[in-house]
Amino acid sequence: MQAVSVHADVVVVRSAFWQTTCTIVHRAAEDGVAECFVIDSPVLPHELEALPVIVEQAGWELSGMLCTHGDWDHLLGRYAFPDAALGCAETTGARLRANPGEAQRELREFDEENYVERPRPLSLGQVQALPVPGHIGIGDTELDLLPADGHTEDGMALRVPWAGVVVCGDYLSPVEIPWLSETGSREAYLATLERLRPWVEEATWVVPGHGTPIDAQRALAILREDVAYLEALPDPSAPIPPARRTGAQRKIHEENLKRVSA
């Protein structure tokens, strides 16, 4: 696991597994009242155990958790902060309600396959659905929320305006090509990329759901590559970007072909 500060108020934690990212955002108001949100989660137990330590060492106090979408690897913050409320997009709230226990089952399958032991079963606890597009207050300002579906049927991206940071969920990854899940959609994915474009153009840092934080120039290059790839589907020769042309990504490409051709 790696933790890097991309701004005085923003720390990004990157898991050793799938390079899944977790973003910690802090904001203090002039009256001294401060708030802190943890967005998404790392994957491995020792990484989750370290999250409260990272927050404490920064001198911050957790206000709540947020998730970009309802895939299980983004919902593990409850292990680190068992009493914190979890905020999500209304689409994610609907997904979780419609598929109770899905995240827990998929986590259990992952743990069994990879010999991972956890202290207890995953409990999502209190989940608050947020209107998206919209905003959520933090300190004396707000985080911006943007719909981000296409990878899955649900999701949101978040912007930290004063820090110039965009947390985009499973989009614009330097290590993963666009992945259309069973509930995903090429058209919705392309629409999300276009919604993200103006945010990325104004950003200092973009935090993808998987991979290291990247600057705006690289994020825009990835966006162009991803648009070209998606628009070429279902052509089997759709251009997988050279930097992401690995065996694992070719498997994702094969899944995408089946989804788009169905």
Model-derived regions, located:
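Conserved beta-strand hairpin/beta-sheet module of binuclear metal-dependent hydrolase folds
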Residues: 2-57, 158-169
